[in-house]
From Swiss-Prot:
Catalyzed chemical reaction(s): 7-aminomethyl-7-carbaguanosine(34) in tRNA + S-adenosyl-L-methionine = epoxyqueuosine(34) in tRNA + adenine + L-methionine + 2 H(+)
A single BP term in Gene Ontology: tRNA wobble guanine modification
Subcellular location: Cytoplasm
Lineage: Bacteria, Pseudomonadati, Pseudomonadota, Gammaproteobacteria, Cardiobacteriales
Main location (coarse class): cytoplasm
Species annotation: Dichelobacter nodosus (strain VCS1703A)
Keyword Methyltransferase: no
E.C. number: 2.4.99.17
Name used for this protein in its record: S-adenosylmethionine:tRNA ribosyltransferase-isomerase
One annotated GO molecular function: S-adenosylmethionine:tRNA ribosyltransferase-isomerase activity
Function: Transfers and isomerizes the ribose moiety from AdoMet to the 7-aminomethyl group of 7-deazaguanine (preQ1-tRNA) to give epoxyqueuosine (oQ-tRNA).
Pathway it works in: tRNA modification; tRNA-queuosine biosynthesis
Keyword Ribosomal protein belongs to the record: no
HAMAP family xrefs: QueA
Keywords recorded for this protein, A-Z: Cytoplasm, Queuosine biosynthesis, S-adenosyl-L-methionine, Transferase
Length: 354
C-alpha cells in the first residue's frame, strides 16, 4: 500500500561537525559522491573528487546552470524612534521597491520610516508577514553601501569578506537572489573550461533564489505545505539547447535544484521546454513525473527540507536515506559550503515512493 508522505519521512540526524561553516580553499577541492540508482532498493555509491565530475559526462550532454547573482540583502538600521531593525530583502520589485522581512522588537507600522545608513525608507504595505518598502535611492545602490551577504542561518556566524566572493558562483550575472544556487559553488573557471573542451554544452537559466528556501516545512502532511514562489526566466537559447541535446540522445543535467525547478516548471511535453518568465511555486516530492531533467548535480540538503524532498523524488526516498547515511559515515561536508553529489540518472516516479 502506498505510504502518504510526511515531513518526518525526511528527517535524519546530522552530527554538528559535518556542517561546513566555511568554504574550502579552492572551489573544486570538494569531494563528490556519485550515486547511480538502479532500483528503489539498489544504489551504487562511489566516493570521488570534484575534478572527477568530467569523467561522468559525455559530449552530447547539456549542463543547465543558474546564473542568478546574490545581492547583499541583509541590512541593519533603526526606526525614527530609535529601535534597532534588521531588513532582509526577499525580492526586488523595481529600482525603488522591495519585498522584505523586517525584524524589530515591535513590528513597524504602515507609513512609518526606517533609517538605513543615511537613507530613510518607507513601509508601504504588509502581506503574509512580508513588507513592501520604498526607497528614494535605488535599492541596488543602498545594498552596495549598507548590505551584507545573506549567508544561511545554519552557518551560525556573521558574513565575512570571503563570503562576498565565495557565496557566489563564478558565472553569476543577473542580480536578484538572496541565497546562492549552491551546487554551482563547486565550479571554477578551470573546471568549466575542461568540461567545455570535452564538448559538453552549457546553457543558463536565471532563477532568483528567495529567502523561502530557508523556511522550514511547518506541516506534517506534505499535501498541506504551501510552497514559496520564486521568479525565473528561461530563454529561447535554453529551449534550443535542450532540443539539440534531445536530438543527440544526450542528458539534460541540472546543476542544482534551482535549475531543475526552472526546467521542470517550463516543461511543455516530450522532454522539451518553452520560453518562460514569471513565478514558479512547483513543489516536487516523491511520485513526481520528471519531464525534462535526466541527471542532477546537487549539494547535501537540510533534514525535512523541500530540497531533500526534491532529490528524494529524483532518486527514491530509501536510496537518498542510504546515500546520506553513507555521506555521514564517510564524513562528507554538508549544506551550502559543503561537498557535492551527482545522480547520473533518475528512478521512474512510482519507484521513488516509500
Amino acid at each position: 500500500m502506498q505510504h502518504t508522505l510526511k515531513k518526518s519521512d525526511f528527517f535524519y540526524e546530522l552530527p554538528e561537525h559535518l556542517i561546513a561553516r566555511y568554504p574550502l580553499q579552492n572551489r573544486s577541492d570538494s569531494r563528490l559522491l556519485v550515486a547511480a540508482v538502479e532500483s528503489a532498493q539498489k544504489v551504487h555509491i562511489s566516493n570521488k573528487q570534484m575534478i572527477d565530475f568530467i569523467d561522468f559526462l559525455k559530449p552530447e550532454d547539456l549542463l543547465v546552470i543558474n546564473n542568478t547573482r546574490v545581492v547583499p540583502a541583509r541590512m541593519f538600521g533603526h526606526k525614527i524612534s530609535g529601535g534597532k531593525v534588521e531588513v532582509f530583502i526577499e525580492r526586488l520589485l523595481s529600482e525603488q521597491r522591495v519585498k522584505a522581512h523586517i525584524r524589530a522588537s515591535k513590528a513597524p507600522l504602515l507609513g512609518s520610516q526606517i533609517v538605513i545608513g543615511a537613507q530613510k525608507v518607507t513601509i508601504e504595505d504588509k502581506k503574509d508577514g512580508i513588507y513592501t518598502v520604498f526607497s528614494e535611492m535605488p535599492w541596488t545602490k543602498l545594498m552596495a553601501q549598507q548590505g551584507k551577504m545573506p549567508i544561511p542561518p545554519y552557518l551560525a556566524r556573521d558574513a565575512e569578506a570571503l563570503d562576498s566572493e565565495r557565496y557566489q558562483t563564478v558565472y553569476a550575472q543577473i542580480a536578484g537572489a538572496v541565497a546562492a544556487p549552491t551546487a554551482g559553488l563547486h565550479f571554477d573557471q578551470k573546471l568549466l573550461e575542461r568540461i567545455a573542451a570535452k564538448g559538453v554544452k552549457r546553457a543558463a537559466i536565471t532563477l532568483h533564489v528567495g529567502a523561502g528556501t530557508f523556511q522550514p516545512v511547518r506541516v506534517e502532511n506534505l499535501n498541506e505545505h504551501v510552497m514559496h514562489q520564486e521568479w525565473f526566466s528561461l530563454s529561447q537559447e535554453v529551449v534550443d539547447a535542450v532540443a539539440a541535446c534531445r536530438a543527440q540522445n544526450g542528458r539534460v543535467i541540472a546543476i542544482g535544484t534551482t535549475a531543475l525547478r526552472a526546467l521542470e516548471s517550463a516543461a511543455i511535453g516530450s522532454g522539451k521546454v518553452g520560453v518562460f518568465q514569471g513565478d514558479t511555486d512547483l513543489f516536487i516530492t516523491p511520485g513526481y513525473e520528471f519531464q525534462v531533467v535526466d541527471a542532477l548535480f546537487t549539494n547535501f540538503h537540510l533534514p525535512e527540507s523541500t530540497l531533500l524532498m526534491l532529490v528524494s523524488a529524483f532518486a527514491g526516498v530509501n536510496n537518498i536515506r542510504r546515500i546520506y547515511q553513507h555521506a555521514i559515515t564517510e564524513q562528507y561536508r554538508f549544506f551550502s559550503y559543503g561537498d557535492a553529489m551527482f545522480l547520473p540518472h533518475r528512478l521512474p516516479a512510482l519507484e521513488t515512493l516509500l
